[in-house]
From Swiss-Prot:
It comes from Dictyostelium discoideum (Social amoeba). This is Heat shock protein DDB_G0283913. InterPro entries: A-crystallin/Hsp20_dom. Residues 18-82 form a coiled coil. GO terms for cellular component: membrane. Belongs to the small heat shock protein (HSP20) family. The chain crosses the membrane at residues 2-22, 224-244. It is a multi-pass membrane protein.
Amino acid sequence: MFVGTLVIIICTTLIIIIKKILKRKKEKLNLKESKKKKQDNERKNFEGLLTKKRVEVGDLKKEIEKLNKDKIELAKKLNCYIGDSSIPANGIREYDIIIDIPSVDYLSQSRKSWIIYVSNQLKQKMGSSNYNKKRPLHSLLKEYKKFSTLACLGVLNKGKTFFINKYNGTYLPSGTQAQTIGLSLSISSLNETITIDTAGSNTALQVCEDKTEEHLARKESTEMFICDMSFSLASIIVYVLNELTWNDQRFILALQSKIQSLRSESNIIKKLLVVHNYPKVNSQEELLSEIKTYIESPFNGNFHHHHVDIKKIESKEEIVLFFVESVNKTHHFFLCNDNSEFGKRYNQLTIEKIRTYKNYNDNLDLDKVLLTSLQNNMIPYCKSPKKLKITEHEPTINQINNNNSSNNKSQLEERPIADSLFQTQSFLHPSIDDTIQDNDKSGSEVSTPTISSSSSSPLQPIIKDEKDDNIENKSDEANTSLKYKPLFTSFGTDEYSKHLKELCKLHQMVSPHRSSIKQIPAFTISPEIDCNRENDFKLIANRIEIIGLNMVFSSGFKPFHDIVKVNSDLRYIIEVPQLEMEDIEFETKHLGSQWYLNIKGIKKLRYDSNDQTTVYPSNLTSLCPSQNQRRDGLFEFSLPIPTEYLPIKPAVSLDKGVITFKFEKIG
């Protein structure tokens, strides 16, 4: 009995233990399955999330590609290239030679010179055995047996550099954020051409404290001088413009007249090409509309439209349109939106046609031509420019220190920028941020800022406390606690201070567009004889006359004259003090339906009374600067001759500095 009970108890205990063991195993199995299920769910969720992220990454990549394409297309529309994505690895991105000309009278300053920058490729040639220090530029370009010179002229931001890039296949910086400096030369072995790019006219004048007239005259003279230099150095002149304006027409007329004079007087042949750049034209219909608007009508009265033909040139089964003026053979070409399908194809064909115009210069001595052109073209703008020389550049101590401290520093910050000639002033007061911070801390009432008459900018907040007129006697600590009053009624005091503070911080962060020079300074242009610089290279046209709304720059000596009728004679009485007959040239010309008396000459000043042959200061004399120096230099003007007077062989007499031309009445 006892044994049976014991067996039952043992069996029951074993059953309970087995059940517990099975239950635990089941729980473990369930837990394992639960973990596995959870892991499977997590894996599925992760795979789903990964797939979603991959889709998002793919979409982002597509968006980035689209943005890059838009960026490149936008850059092309702006005629400039942004970043490296649109420029081939072997693409030419810099000029070969840059002649930096801050101002035409820059050499009037002691120890100043124009700097010639060259690319790394040309710089390496300076150490070769063929390099000649006496003819440095000729040595660097000696490998080019023959080449044509092309100058690109035009107003600022009209597409000059864009044209050069298309012409040479280069990627030079262009557009509103890049400005060409001085005379920038690009050498193309493909076209056998040296192209000359310029900064363009109508650029803004920097702020100046005093002598505003002199700064304006200097700006005008420098732009004209650089334009004259480009014209004299080139055999092919390309004038780039957008929609034709009256200023463009006048400039084209001046170029045509100058080219015709050189051809007839000196047998110098130059070719003028006018390139009309239309960045908004996307089709041939739009181009023909532009031609009818800006070519046919404006040139109708001036260039005899019935003699002008639209020529058709077959090139690669495509047609290129261009105008040829029958009177002076000036060719007009057209460029369209390079981003459009039509413009891209049409521009390429137009450039191919323009490349066919060549005027080669064999064995051109660039050093001699450059120096001669510089001196001759300075004559209308400077008092008595002397001979110039080209020497190797010797960096100053400051430039060496700057190069050692920062190799990536822009050359523009190291080069002199017309030191005392052009001066800029700050946009905001240097302590404005500190003042605003003090206002935020004080939280008190803000007073109205008043702008001082000596302020360099209308936005420069020179603040004056209304409660104390004698602000100048306060300490610096008191001045830093000056208060602002809102200038805009829509802002509260705190909102205005916060807004102005953010504006000032943003102003400090942004940088203006700069034209940095990455090339290496290699040579300098300076006077051969370094004496009397201030007088020899002094600016002539430093006075301005306002006629209506136009500024007229007076340059050099301008003779006064009277027109007098005596009985049946007509007399032109002209004051020419200190001049002899051999100093004056005159002739009568028939232009259109009118006869003119054309008079030109040069007036030279004499300073040494003991030696009448001394034209400029001798070793015994020195010229002291004065505000009202006597006028000298070249002069030329024309006077109309009425039809009732005989226009040829006038009687001429010179007495006591007055020259008289007498014309007899016909009949």
